[in-house]
């Protein structure tokens, strides 16, 4: 699959922009804070309905304007899709596929699969469990609409249970209703735990091989799913900690407390790995993500690289660039030295200056 073009109106610092992409490598270069990342954000938003930078639509609307429009044309298995997205202040975003409005955002998922790689992703190993859960959920929601539905349901039930726990401080008589939410939480939570475990097992096979090659055949990386409770024990554990949950007014066990273990040998590199090991592992994880998406959808996802090359040494740069030759890639960077040095083929080059984009014919 490829993104054929993107049109932006009043999106971030762009008043009116129309870009046609090559099916190979597309590079956007320029100084910081010129609008390079905004183009990648618009692409990611078109496929996932979410921004990697903010949670509120109004933050993406150009200053002084009331609404924003994004039109993305995607070609997938010889079929063309036009995705229109309207962002407005204090209103839910409007989405249409081939000019037909959709009622649920989940209807969009699966049309445009992407892998987003930014400098922040290099810290996924050393950051807290929430970042690693966000990674799991982001990838699974793109690939599995049932998982997306289950996760949405689980979060709603979790919020209701937590609200009830807080209300019980003043209304002890509400305790009898807690079991209703517990049953629903366990039923949905078990599905999430099982699907995450399956996903991590599949990902581990790929990440091990890739990391072994990147590390010069020196390191064996193991990726393991760490649920806060095994699915078969979820109901019993939730009952066991009920009094504690009531005191703390929060749900202390469940998939919302899960984690991913990254280990090399017997070493937990989340805590004890060197920066080099953590960054190489993060790169291995992202490259594995591309391969797993390929296997899952029998197509190649679009790769978005947001100023990540400057954070990698020359060996990792080289490995990354050589791994994406058959993938449509949108890259942002401040300069082109890495590509010249690595003799990397570039299909299209765009110079970005203060919200204007100019295509260049050569480096």
Region roles according to the model:
Residues 1-31, 171-302, 311, 315, ...:
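Conserved NTPase motor "head" modules and their coupling/switch loops across ABC/AAA+ ATPases, GTPases
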Residues 35-36:
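Conserved lysine of the Walker
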Residues 45-57, 288-296:
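Post-Walker A helix-loop "phosphate-sensing" segment adjacent to the P-loop in P-loop NTPases
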Residues 48-125, 129-131, 140-143, 147, ...:
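Nucleotide-state sensing region of NTPase/ATPase domains
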Residues 72, 328-335:
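Structural recognition of the conserved hydrophobic beta-strand(s) that form the central parallel beta-sheet
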Residues 106-114, 118-183, 187, 359-360:
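A conserved P-loop NTPase coupling/switch region
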Residues 306-308:
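Walker B catalytic acidic pair
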